[in-house]
Amino acid sequence: MGKNVVVLGTQWGDEGKGKVVDLLTERAKYVVRYQGGHNAGHTLVINGEKTVLHLIPSGILRENVVSIIGNGVVLAPDALMKEMTELEARGVPVRERLLLSEACPLILPYHVALDNAREKARGAKAIGTTGRGIGPAYEDKVARRGLRVGDLFDKETFAVKLKEIVEYHNFQLVNYYKVDAVDYQKVLDDVLAIADILTAMVVDVSDLLYKAHLRGDFVMFEGAQGTLLDIDHGTYPYVTSSNTTAGGVATGSGLGPRYVDYVLGIVKAYSTRVGAGPFPTELFEEVGEHLSQKGNEFGATTGRRRRTGWLDAVAVRRAVQINSLSGFCLTKLDVLDGLKEIKICVGYRLPNGTEVDTTPLAAEGWEGLEPIYETVPGWSESTFGVKDHSKLPQAALNYIKRIEEITGVPIDIISTGPDRSETMVLRDPFDA
């Protein structure tokens, strides 16, 4: 039988999923995106060459791998074409390697206009979205008025449906938000110009994945964002609009949940967050600056500087519960090099003095939380690029062991640099 492995983030995104997916796809036949959209930013460094992908799965650079965008992904046609064009200019035959679900909702210009108008109207209470129309596109999906990739097979009917939706959203844009209307004809012309390219890549994803499983193929499911940004389980309302957790694999691809064999949680050796929302372990002074600069903590999608802080093991434990994690991949260990001591958040103290060891569900519940820290010794030696587990400093090994003890999950992979080769695979998920 085949093996289905899920790779997802255990924190607030930006954990280093892209590199790990790219590494593990060496053994995979398919790589599947199952949620999110081009608000993701997955950075791959292969032989020193950097590639940033937002929508196309990270397996696209491997010639023996088929990349799939599942129904749980909201797809911006213009963003997909831009990414395809850039990759094709580098000699990557994207159209031979990429497949799409016809059930993918389309992100169109009115979604982007709504996203930006709403963020502006929220003022100081802005969520910090990427402004790419992700949330409004999911809204249209749930309201059952959204257009999907499959609608492009019938261009005349697509035009009629689009006109109704543009009129609906333009009313809100013009009358409530007092911004310009979206040009229906331009939207229609732009989408129809590339419709045939998109429909040529359409496949029944659920059927494909089921048959792949029966054949014994290895499949990798690539998560975007992170567990604490999940629409249901994250720091609501400072979350994304999709299910970033393991449950999203089944609903976002059509694979039966019993067929998931291993869930790999990517955990950064410290914490980061982009945009607004709770972040109990956030650091503002010298150590925070160290993590930000040494870790190059700037968003691959937005370019925004990420907030940085100590590892929040309470939040990571929540990710263990929700995702039924099989193992961790620890990333950016080298960023902690040179710190005399390292702190791990093992609990929270509420404003009334009560100590808790689980995360609140809504953002309001995080207000006034104080992290309870455990301090461990740091190390002065460099871990950058180390490929042999036994050659890591003893203090680094102790830190790794402590994370395993607190979370109850083994660290199966350790990343010590951005390049694909700078990785230690202690237990391969496809063999676990």
From Swiss-Prot:
Catalytic activity annotation: IMP + L-aspartate + GTP = N(6)-(1,2-dicarboxyethyl)-AMP + GDP + phosphate + 2 H(+)
Family annotation (CDD domains): AdSS (cd03108)
List the active-site residues: 14 (proton acceptor), 42 (proton donor)
Q: What does this protein do?
A: Plays an important role in the de novo pathway of purine nucleotide biosynthesis. Catalyzes the first committed step in the biosynthesis of AMP from IMP.
- Write out the similarity annotation: Belongs to the adenylosuccinate synthetase family.
What subunit structure does UniProt give? Homodimer.
The identity of this protein, by name, is Adenylosuccinate synthetase
The organism is Pectobacterium atrosepticum (strain SCRI 1043 / ATCC BAA-672)
Gene for this protein? purA
